[in-house]
């Protein structure tokens, strides 16, 4: 359908797609950067800490990305209702999405807890690494319900063309993650020593030394990440409650019990998306476990590569999410030819960005390796 529209239409739709996808992309990169920061700072604590975080993060990321795909079913549903002018339906679906995220998060948390002992037994590593792995995975599991509720709120806001607040909240979460990582990985005393080295205010240094926070090593990265997940969820929920532009949808103006028919509809649409996300994510995350027997150096190196690939993956993922919203909105307005056209524009944009990413990786591969 690309040939049925003028170049001006293509330019217009590309602008609309990029206006929606770029904030999504930047926000997703900030989220992935939290994992990169965890990796880097855990490595500063020691090779064993980095290995434990790499193994735990690979398990958590695989499940989280899979469930994130299931939650992505909310985007076309809400966008289509928005396009059809269903103000009440949009708010109700948003509330049902929060319930769905909570229930899916509790299920995922139970799965992660159940996997800890079998995966510990599988690892042929030191008892210290096994213990840190178990503690890290158990702690980040507590943040999974918050992370999936956040995905429901994310889908609601982005489907209503409000991706910018999500982007700023994600970057605020990243900035919060850095000092929290210092605090929990190196302890209050270690963080105070760092603050003293950078000539921070004496009052701040004295306050840090009084905090009863021990150095948790790599496990501390899990504590910081869990706190950041809950922070992001409450921050986005507060924005949605206060936003004047979104007030007409009534998202926070009433309480809804779980509607099992709606829950089933979300799951029916989302399981295939989740499966595709799982297959894509596991191509990278499972490699950490396949090479675990080779030792800590190989695991640490793979985690660095995984962090970079995760950042790159956010580019097409953001284009796809933005296209889903645009197409769903067009379908809601019964503009089926326009919906097909938007899908074509999205594919072309994806090809171009993919080619640019490939060239950038080839040109800058050595500097990127040196940074790692």
Task: Give the predicted meaning of each segment.
Residues 17, 50-51, 163-167, 218-222, ...:
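Alpha-helical transmembrane segments and their helix-entry boundary regions
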Residues 107-138, 187-188, 195-199, 204-208, ...:
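Short membrane-interface helical motifs at transmembrane helix boundaries
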Residues 19-38, 139, 150, 173, ...:
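Transmembrane helical elements of multi-pass membrane transporters/channels
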Residues 136, 169-183, 188-246:
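Hydrophobic alpha-helical transmembrane segments
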Residues 127-153, 308-310:
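Alpha-helical transmembrane segments of multi-pass membrane proteins
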Residues 50-110, 147-166, 302-365:
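Small-residue-rich hydrophobic transmembrane alpha-helices
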Residues 33-36, 44-47, 81-84, 159-160, ...:
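Helix-loop interface residues and adjacent transmembrane-helix termini in multi-pass membrane transporters
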Residues 1-19, 198-209, 218, 225, ...:
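Interhelical loop/hinge segments that connect adjacent transmembrane helices in multipass membrane
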């Amino acid at each position: 359908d690309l040939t049925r529209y003028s170049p001006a239409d293509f330019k217009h739709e590309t602008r609309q797609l990029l206006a929606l996808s770029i904030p999504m992309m930047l926000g997703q990169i900030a989220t992935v950067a939290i994992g990169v920061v965890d990796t880097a700072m855990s490595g500063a604590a020691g090779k064993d800490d980095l290995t434990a975080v790499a193994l735990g993060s690979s398990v958590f990321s695989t499940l989280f990305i899979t469930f994130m795909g299931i939650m992505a079913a909310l985007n076309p549903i809400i966008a289509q209702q928005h396009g059809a002018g269903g103000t009440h339906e949009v708010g109700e679906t948003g509330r049902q999405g929060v319930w769905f995220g909570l229930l899916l998060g509790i299920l995922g948390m139970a799965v992660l807890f159940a996997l800890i002992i079998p995966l510990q037994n599988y690892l042929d590593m030191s008892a210290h690494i096994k213990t840190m792995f178990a503690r890290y995975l158990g702690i980040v599991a507590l943040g999974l319900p918050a992370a999936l509720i956040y995905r429901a709120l994310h889908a609601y806001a982005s489907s209503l063309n409000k991706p910018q607040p999500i982007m700023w909240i994600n970057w605020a979460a990243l900035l919060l993650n850095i000092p929290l990582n210092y605090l929990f990985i190196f302890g209050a005393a270690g963080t105070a020593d760092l603050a003293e080295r950078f000539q921070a205010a004496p009052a701040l240094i004295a306050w840090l030394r009084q905090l009863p926070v021990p150095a948790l090593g790599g496990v501390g990265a899990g504590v910081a990440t869990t706190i950041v997940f809950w922070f992001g969820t409450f921050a986005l929920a507060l924005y949605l409650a206060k936003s004047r532009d979104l007030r007409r949808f009534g998202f926070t103006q009433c309480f809804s019990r779980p509607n099992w028919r709606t829950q089933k509809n979300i799951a029916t649409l989302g399981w295939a998306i989740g499966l595709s996300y799982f297959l894509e994510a596991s191509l990278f995350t499972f490699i950490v476990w396949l090479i675990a027997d080779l030792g800590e150096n190989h695991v640490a190196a793979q985690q660095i590569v995984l962090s970079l690939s995760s950042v790159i993956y956010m580019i097409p993922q953001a284009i796809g999410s933005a296209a889903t919203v645009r197409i769903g909105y067009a379908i809601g307005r019964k503009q089926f030819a326009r919906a097909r056209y938007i899908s074509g524009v999205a594919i072309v944009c994806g090809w171009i960005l993919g080619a640019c990413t490939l060239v950038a990786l080839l040109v800058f591969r050595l500097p990127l390796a040196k940074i790692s």
